[in-house]
């Protein structure tokens, strides 16, 4: 029986990695070893940043809500507490969208929170 050297399998494996590394800078899209390392790092970055994105958006929403709340004479924490007391269940994403797009609706929510806080 003839010896099989596995050239087809090796080429397929290298080709797959180099295809994933397409568009990378410098040797990282040409040389197999550096491409493999960069692809592995890319998977790590993608995994990490999918979680980071959730934190970043939450921070952005809170910043926008805080700015709009202060324009209505409340701090962020006072607004959120007042909304909870008023049993208004609006998530931060929706609140931030209201703060940017519909200031009148946000003011109505802020007034409801103020009423429950006794301000």
From Swiss-Prot:
GO terms for cellular component: ribonucleoprotein complex; ribosome. It comes from the Bacteria. One of its GO terms (molecular function) is structural constituent of ribosome. Signal peptide: none annotated. The keyword RNA-binding applies. Keywords: Ribonucleoprotein, Ribosomal protein, RNA-binding, rRNA-binding. Binds directly to 23S ribosomal RNA and is necessary for the in vitro assembly process of the 50S ribosomal subunit. It is not involved in the protein synthesizing functions of that subunit. Belongs to the bacterial ribosomal protein bL20 family. NCBIfam families: rplT_bact. This is Large ribosomal subunit protein bL20.
